[in-house]
Amino acid sequence: TTPKVLWINSPGNPTGAVLPVEHLAKVVAWARRHGVVVAADECYAELDWRQPDPRRPGPRHTTPSLLDPAVCGGSHEGLLAVYSLSKQSNLAGYRAAFVAGDPALIAGLVEVRRHAGMMVPGPVQAAMTVALRDDEHVADQRLRYGVRREILIEALEGVGLRIEHSEAGLY
């Protein structure tokens, strides 16, 4: 049986592995051949650790999005990217998130949301708008998480544990 939806996480939970553009493009091509919607959890995309020192300024790696033209060929058909501001903007209690992608799929989600009473409060929408316009606080959060991550890695490796695939996210 062919699935209706393929859900992917990149950065992955719990490994922190990041799917490269080439792999994501293959997933999209396969899904389109089989009429499968691809939904991608990209909530930790701003917490990409694949640079020498996340505390230093300068160019950094970014987690590729399902909606990147190099991945989707410029068409969002059959694709949904799910994004939360919980970690990057420290808005976990706000339940601040959004879905982007295929306009037809988004319209269906909006209808369900409207009739199910799942409204995002106005103040939360305003906070999201401010947060999405400000990259500086995201860099600050990345720095905080990066420092904590290094302390944890050192402690875990100090007792003989091995860390694998931890490229991004909180993992």
Pin down the residues of each PLM region.
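Structural signature of PLP-dependent enzymes
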Residues: L109-R114, A131-E154
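Active-site pre-lysine segment of PLP-dependent enzymes
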Residues: T1-T2, G12-V37, E42-L91
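Active-site C-terminal subdomain of aminotransferase-like
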Residues: G74-S75, A104-V124
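Structural motif of enzymes handling amino- and sulfur-group chemistry
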Residues: P103, V120-D135, D140-Q141
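Short beta-strand-to-turn element immediately C-terminal to the catalytic PLP-Schiff-base lysine
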Residues: A96-P103
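Conserved glycine-rich beta-strand-loop-beta hairpin in the small C-terminal domain of fold type I
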Residues: Q125, T129, Y145-I153, I163-Y171
